[in-house]
Amino acid sequence: MSAKNYDVVIMGAGHNGLVAATYLAKAGKSVLILEANDEIGGATQSVQAFPGFDARVSRYSYLVALLPDKIIKDLQLTFETISRDVSSFTPYSTTSGENEGLYVSRNWDSKTEESFKEIDPTGNEGRAWQDFYAEVAEFAHKIAPTLLQPLQTRSQLREQINLPKVWKYLIEDPIGEVICERFKSDIVRGVVLTDALIGTFASAYDLQANICFLYHLIGNGTGEWKVPRGGMGALVNELVRVATESGVEIRTNQKVVAIESTSDYVKVKTSSGDEFIASHFLSNAAPGVLAEIRGKKKPESLDGAQLKINILLKRLPQLKSGIDPQLAFAGTFHANESFTQCEVTYNEAKGGKMPTKLPIEMYCHTLTDPSILSPELSAAGFHTLTLFALHTPASLFDKDNDAARAAALESAFASLNEYLVEPIQDVIAAIEIKTPLDLEEAIALPRGNIFHKDLQFPFREDGSQPSWGVETDDPRIFICGAGATRGGGVSGIPGHNAAMAVLGSN
């Protein structure tokens, strides 16, 4: 069988692969996407995860912040994200044993101010919060447009942003030191810190935490995390529509097993025995997966370190603090995520011990967007709950994944139940738990790392070669997935940048 020719072959039909393919096809390139699984979307797919229940959940990725409006406009996507009125709620116990909670709305209001004053009657902590996030927002507004441009050098970007104080505490000083300097409450410090730890197994004093924090706060120039109407699968469906309408060919159940590169072309072989020839090859898979196929050394990277739990609830549980559950779970719900607790559990996990009370955060998609449930389930009061536990590195699951999964679930529930009137187990209709090793098996995330590899600052070092942050050691092979510089999260940014790099190389 003779090999079929394309301008570009892309490995992986995740959202970034679809974004790259559509940009290239709109520029007149012939594009083929090869997807190893029978489902398109990778980590952004929506599935019926609970047998017997008509609920389509975003199994692996949940909220949208990093997807630039420019990509939505360029590709003419009909895709809606919904703002959450509540930013977060963090239950805590006072020294006298009272059950309280820190409520933070999306926009500062009297309820939020009152909640901060329960922690600090002077009002200083609330003012510190407003000042800190106003500075971060200004930084985000300035850096966001550069994410869709060739990488600037560290010096160029620092000069362009021109916020020396903010640059220093976001880029140069350990974020843990900055947080402890700016805030006094252990609870408030923890809420700020969690954005530095999502999917990142690091101490608050490690610069890897700074990088994670930065990406969680700069999305679209606002850092606001929104709910995708219809679930993440709605984004995938739109991307498939615009890709195929632009002429992109997508083949599923086509696992790439070999890549042969010459000075003139790249030859791609799949597990089904098919061969394709292209001028350029883009990998939406993790750099470690690409390296393995090419027979190269895998890049070293941190373990993935999160437990993902999808839950279908018969009803929302009541909280000891007395807050309306529809408020508490509408934003991000933090439990046992004080600054001290996060550091203690990090050190426990680093020492090889499963923490007894995991730091957890979660949100209820259906309070903002009930469309992912059937009308019958909605009418009966059902809700989805997506729980994310921190500091559960893949190494804790290596010896016995099943036993460690059960222990991690017990630990996560212990954290949550501490603040509920009734155990969460009493209101669960169905549940699905994914450890880092489960994520590696299901969607080829190396060691369960949701960012494919360690995140990097969104610039290149002074004196380095100009790049888009998507290049490899082969001029015909590019990274278009989360493992690119400025990758990670649901953003489409590395897909856009890989497409621009290909078009620029011609």
Please give the residue ranges for each predicted region.
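N-terminal glycine-rich phosphate/pyrophosphate-binding loop and immediately adjacent elements
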Residues: A3-K142, D303
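A glycine-rich dinucleotide-binding beta-alpha-beta segment and adjacent secondary-structure elements
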Residues: S185, R189-A202, P355-Y363, E422-T485
